[in-house]
């Protein structure tokens, strides 16, 4: 509450907007007249700013209005967030720390659209041409991936020497360092923190340990990584652990870093036996789950498979991994069809160009941003039957997505330039005389959304309905990949196609297209009443309602995607009648050899009882242990498990349309 003084309005306008003194004085006089006429007993700064903003708009001063805007939320929205009146999808409720983060993210979203992105980019986001993911995290990169060797070599260090530890000498200390590093990095990125080749990287610390000790290390790693959500106020971070049966080709002959950050005199290839034993222990710990037998929150295991994996021990491991997937979910099988693909799929950059000359303790890459493009929008903007116009529109969408990336990159570069005194101090820190994150090792993800819906609009068929549709879909992906290469060369940065996992994005695109482009069959666009467009199909996937065998789905998605999308997986939705681990392992092995599919994830559902705490695989209306009807279904939404009761209507409808896989269908 302030005492009204017109001179302060003049000072504020000149300071915040650079307005000419005479114009600022005129606006101040207008505001003073309004206040005098209103007979208000109290005049707050918020009210004054609102009145000034209205006058700036009245005078046609749009740039000055944007500069003068106050960012914030209505009281009802803040009340809803604090009291959590809305249902949340995540398994954990928000703590006061979490609600503070939610409110801050909402304000940052406004700031991003007003102050970071240009008007054309902001408009493209608002009208649904593109979707800039994680606007509430505008001041941080999207995701980061690194080798554990970074922590092994230099220990755990916080910026400005706030806290530091020497390189670990024992496996349990190394686990603590990895967990603390993950927790620290999750404050600097909004997406996943990924660790590469974890079982091989930790192997030099585990040499000589028995099976019980290996299991204890594995259990500590799993539990501690899943507990980092406590520090985020209930917001579940994602930690991705990459695992290998064969030592990755790019790591095989590299000198191994062992206890104390010292080289052991051996290569990682020499630790294959202990790395495999630790891999067994990790899946055993993961299968046990947490203390309530629930899936570990926020952890995703990625088991990489290569064409060389053929020995009986590998087959036994796959069965074990499939059993963990059936009982706990969140296990992703990644298929490294070539040595180049093995590195690219993890770091998003080619090994030879970016990392071949660097030591393993320098291996760190980040995705600065992820921007989704609305593929069906290209069909809506083009004239019916004009395929050339569709591809021209796709090029335009790629250009505007690239522009949004460049604008955020400039913003982040300014923050990084402030070094260890800036907000991105941990990423700007120097390790061993070298920067922790090099700008040359950053990528920008462009995420196609709705290829199936675009294909249906252009060809009259969904991807699974005809080879003509799949050929068209493959042409679209090839065009987008070529555009990403062109834009990378033009702007001297790395644009990559990737699969998006943003919640609510596909529904938003579908609703905005229905609002702005209400097409009918008379306009030349085929409609299908059995396929309501309330939620586009994500990425370059086939419809979840397509009645196909999982092998056929994986084959056709691989043909369309052509290995061009990072993090692309074929979803296998499981019903209540689960297949056996052996049946699922047979599917994994069959898909592995098609040379096309990049990933496979089998996702069961879970029923958690709110009364007795019992957790069972499958979706049920009552608890199998105590019979109570107070149960909650946990299911996969995009790439994480969440409470179905908190899903949107469109997401729940999509879940009901999913074709479930049973042992008979395999």
Q: Which residues does each PLM region occupy?
A:
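Long, charge-rich boundary regions
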Residues: 625-666
């Amino acid at each position: 509450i302030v005492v009204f003084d017109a001179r302060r309005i003049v000072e504020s306008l000149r300071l915040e907007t650079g307005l000419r003194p005479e114009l600022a004085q005129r606006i101040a006089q207008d505001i003073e007249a309004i206040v005098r006429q209103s007979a208000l007993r109290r005049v707050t700064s918020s009210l004054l700013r609102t009145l000034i903003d209205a006058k700036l708009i009245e005078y046609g001063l749009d740039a000055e209005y944007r500069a003068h805007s106050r960012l914030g939320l209505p009281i009802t929205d803040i009340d809803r967030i604090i009291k959590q009146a809305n249902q949340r999808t995540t398994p954990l409720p928000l703590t006061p720390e979490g609600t503070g983060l939610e409110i801050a993210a909402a304000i940052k979203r406004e700031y991003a659209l007003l102050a970071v992105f240009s008007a054309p980019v902001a408009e493209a986001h608002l009208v649904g041409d593109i979707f800039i993911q994680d606007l509430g995290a505008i001041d941080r990169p999207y995701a980061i991936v690194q080798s554990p060797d970074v922590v092994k070599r230099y220990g755990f260090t916080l910026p400005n020497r706030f806290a530091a530890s020497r390189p670990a000498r024992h496996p349990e200390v190394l686990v603590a360092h990895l967990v603390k590093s993950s927790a620290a990095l999750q404050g600097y990125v909004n997406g996943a923190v990924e660790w590469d080749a974890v079982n091989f990287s930790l192997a030099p610390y585990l040499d000589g340990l028995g099976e019980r000790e290996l299991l204890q290390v594995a259990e500590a790693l799993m539990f501690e990584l899943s507990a980092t959500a406590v520090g985020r106020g209930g917001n579940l971070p994602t930690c991705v652990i990459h695992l290998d049966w064969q030592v990755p080709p790019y790591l095989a002959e590299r000198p191994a870093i062992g206890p104390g950050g010292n080289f052991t005199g051996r290569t990682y290839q020499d630790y294959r036996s202990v790395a495999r034993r630790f891999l067994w222990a990790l899946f055993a710990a993961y299968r046990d789950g947490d203390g309530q037998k629930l899936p570990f929150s926020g952890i995703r295991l990625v088991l990489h498979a290569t064409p060389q994996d053929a020995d009986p021990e590998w087959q036994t491991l796959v069965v074990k991994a499939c059993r963990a997937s059936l009982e706990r979910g969140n296990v992703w099988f990644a298929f490294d069809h070539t040595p180049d693909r093995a590195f690219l799929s993890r770091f998003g950059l080619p090994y030879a160009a970016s990392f071949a000359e660097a030591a393993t303790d320098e291996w760190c890459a980040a995705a600065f941003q992820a921007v989704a493009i609305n593929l069906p929008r290209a069909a809506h903007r083009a004239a019916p039957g004009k395929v050339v116009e569709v591809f021209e529109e796709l090029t335009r969408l790629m250009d505007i997505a690239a522009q949004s990336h460049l604008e955020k990159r400039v913003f982040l570069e300014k923050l990084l330039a402030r070094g260890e005194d800036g907000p991105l101090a941990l990423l700007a820190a120097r390790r061993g005389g070298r920067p922790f994150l090099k700008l040359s090792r950053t990528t920008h993800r462009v995420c196609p959304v709705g290829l199936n819906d675009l294909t249906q609009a252009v060809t009259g068929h969904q991807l699974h309905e005809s080879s003509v549709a799949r050929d068209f879909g493959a042409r679209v992906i090839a065009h987008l990949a070529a555009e990403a290469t062109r834009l990378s060369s033009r702007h001297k940065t790395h644009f990559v196609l990737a699969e998006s996992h943003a919640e609510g994005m596909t529904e938003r695109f579908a609703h905005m297209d229905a609002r702005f482009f209400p097409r009918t069959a008379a306009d030349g666009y085929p409609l299908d009443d059995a396929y309501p467009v309330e939620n586009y199909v994500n990425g370059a996937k086939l419809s979840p309602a397509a009645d196909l065998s999982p092998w056929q789905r994986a084959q056709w998605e691989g043909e369309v995607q052509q290995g061009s999308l990072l993090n692309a997986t074929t979803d296998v939705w499981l019903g209540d009648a689960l297949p056996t681990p052996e049946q699922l392992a047979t599917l994994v092995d069959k898909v592995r050899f098609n040379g096309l599919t990049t990933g496979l994830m089998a996702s069961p559902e879970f029923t958690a009882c709110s009364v007795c705490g019992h957790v069972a695989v499958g979706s049920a209306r009552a608890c199998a242990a105590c019979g109570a009807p107070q149960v909650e279904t946990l299911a996969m939404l995009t790439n994480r498990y969440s409470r179905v009761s908190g899903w949107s209507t469109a997401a729940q409808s999509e879940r009901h349309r999913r074709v479930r896989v049973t042992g008979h269908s395999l």
